[in-house]
């Protein structure tokens, strides 16, 4: 068995069966079953779902959507990613799989917006996301240039 990696998930019934393993593990708002079923019905080949397989089973997943800021009152201008529904099966939590998914998204080098769910604020803080509060609610943002500057400063020290 090779080292697990992040991959784009296919929109098919096998993935739908894999998603059923996550049902009941987390909060209802993390459920992706309906979203995946809608994509199967629409025959959408451009999957927004990413995951990590380990031992042939899906153990972690997230949704990534490319967006453009259309006047929303927050600090991202232009194109950015919305990271939704990051979830790792209980037996695989605290082993770096959630961080692998986020680092995959960071590697695309777009700003990222996400909403912290279920006591996960510390996770986003650890990954250099900044909290943002607006009248509609709170969320976290990561900027590629902030991360690149931090690496450059560390390398020069």
From Swiss-Prot:
Name under which the protein is recorded: Uncharacterized N-acetyltransferase BA_4060/GBAA_4060/BAS3772
EC numbers on record: 2.3.1.-
Keywords: Acyltransferase, Transferase
Top-level taxonomic group: Bacteria
Ligase as UniProt keyword: no
Catalytic class of the enzyme: transferase
Domain N-acetyltransferase residue range list: 9-146
InterPro entries (alphabetical): Acyl_CoA_acyltransferase, GNAT_dom, YlbP
One annotated GO molecular function: acyltransferase activity, transferring groups other than amino-acyl groups
Organism of this sequence: Bacillus anthracis
NCBIfam families reported for this sequence: PRK13688.1 (NF010241)
């Amino acid at each position: 068995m090779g080292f697990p990696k992040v991959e784009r998930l296919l929109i098919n019934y096998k993935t739908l069966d894999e998603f059923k393993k996550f049902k009941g593990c987390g909060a209802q708002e993390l459920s992706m079953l309906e979203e995946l079923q809608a994509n199967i019905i629409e025959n959408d080949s451009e999957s927004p779902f990413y995951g990590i397989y380990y031992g042939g089973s899906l153990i972690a997943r997230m949704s990534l959507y490319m967006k453009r800021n259309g006047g929303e009152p927050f600090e991202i201008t232009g194109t950015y990613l919305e990271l939704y529904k990051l979830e790792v099966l209980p037996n695989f939590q605290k082993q770096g799989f959630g961080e692998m998914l986020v680092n995959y998204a960071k590697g695309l080098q777009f700003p990222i917006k996400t909403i912290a769910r279920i006591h996960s604020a510390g996770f986003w803080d650890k990954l250099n996301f900044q909290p943002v509060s607006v009248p509609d609610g709170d969320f976290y943002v990561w900027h590629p240039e902030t991360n690149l500057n931090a690496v450059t400063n560390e390398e020069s020290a």
